[in-house]
């Protein structure tokens, strides 16, 4: 009985930790800085010349899937972790999913992240996301946004960088709200609007209209 009780306690503690991680990120979800300035810079790149990719490129060449999408029960008041986590050593290269442009990025967080660390928002990304890249890409004539979080410092490509599928866009780190080295990845299906059209109308929402926390489960994308 004692073993069963200890196991249940450990599982509850893990769920509470996971919920807190999701809530922290949800508190800061809007790009910082001048959105109009960003749009002007993106427009000058001529994104309509980017050719659509024929499929998704794997984000890493090594590592393991350490977490998928979690949904927490009422015993911890709900909560959600959207996307997936790939655990690998610090410095492992992260590759672009497809041809596109870095719509937003954040750098300047150290690689000594911990649970509750809010670094990322002041650097231009989401709170707790550490060093991060938001890639706007076209794959099979469909536009997607791909979010990569918790990168090593000085590795994220800068906003406005045009990339090809498979180009390195950063490296795995331990920045922001984490307990170990990994990259958190989310994919948002945005429709058939061109890259340039989407970028010019983007509101700065780093959840791309899908919502954050439990609200993210109420949208299909």
Language-model features: where?
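Domain-scale macromolecular recognition modules
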Residues: 52-101, 105
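Glycine-rich phosphate-binding loop
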Residues: 178
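Short, well-structured beta-strand-loop connectors
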Residues: 93-105, 156-172
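Alpha-helical oligomerization segments with coiled-coil/rod-like character
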Residues: 1-53
């Amino acid at each position: 009985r004692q073993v069963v009780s200890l196991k249940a306690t450990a599982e509850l503690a893990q769920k509470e930790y996971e919920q807190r991680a999701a809530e922290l990120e949800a508190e800061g979800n809007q790009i910082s800085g001048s959105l109009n300035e960003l749009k002007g810079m993106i427009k000058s790149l001529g994104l309509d010349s980017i050719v659509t990719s024929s499929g998704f490129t794997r984000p890493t060449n090594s590592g393991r899937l350490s977490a998928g999408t979690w949904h927490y029960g009422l015993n911890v008041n709900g909560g959600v972790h959207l996307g997936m986590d790939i655990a690998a050593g610090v410095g492992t290269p992260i590759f672009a999913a497809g041809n596109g442009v870095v719509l937003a990025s954040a750098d300047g967080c150290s690689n000594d992240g911990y649970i509750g660390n809010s670094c990322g928002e002041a650097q231009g990304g989401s709170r707790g996301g550490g060093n991060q890249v938001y890639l706007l890409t076209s794959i099979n004539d469909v536009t997607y946004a791909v979010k990569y979080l918790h990168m090593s410092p000085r590795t994220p490509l800068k906003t406005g960088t045009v990339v090809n599928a498979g180009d390195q866009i950063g490296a795995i780190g331990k920045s922001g709200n984490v307990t170990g080295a990994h990259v958190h990845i989310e994919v948002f299906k945005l429709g058939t609007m061109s890259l340039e059209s989407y970028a010019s109308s983007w509101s700065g929402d780093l959840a791309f209209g899908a919502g954050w926390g439990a609200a993210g489960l109420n949208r299909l994308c």
